[in-house]
Amino acid sequence: VLAKDDAARFEGFLTAANTARSVRSNLIQMSNLLKNVNTGSLTPVGREIASVMTSLGMDVNPDWNAVQAAEAIANKLVLDFAGGSLGTGIATSDRTFIEKMGPQVTQTPQGRQIIIDFAIKKADRDIQVGQMARQWQQKVGRLDKPDVNGRSFYDYLDQWAEQNPLVKRAP
């Protein structure tokens, strides 16, 4: 059972790293799209007005194209944050909760950028842990198998995570 659990954890690290690469790219793209676009709680209203104007053949601010693309990316991020699928039993309130975890066009540009920056750090962390797990597996074998110092991958991972926090505490 332990070997099976260890293999599942190893696979989890690799899956998280692969997902993180896609998430990271999407976050950077969203940040670039909305870099100079003023957004906030009224963005959905403005988007609908721009859509009506476009339907009537009127020119609209090209920023609205960026907003539409960013919304599509935000929807993809919801799936990524949910593990690739929302499943059959997910309620609307669950989806709304997951949406609010990630960057959205309804957030202020500054607030959204803080969320994007943290999510990129988290994605980078997942990629690093996946690489570390692969290296350990190649050198030592199973993740729970101790090395010559008597420490397992998880011991080193705990120490590394403590030394490399995603968020530094305010003084």
Residue map of PLM features:
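A sequence/structure-level signal for intrinsically flexible, low-complexity segments enriched in small
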Residues: 1-171
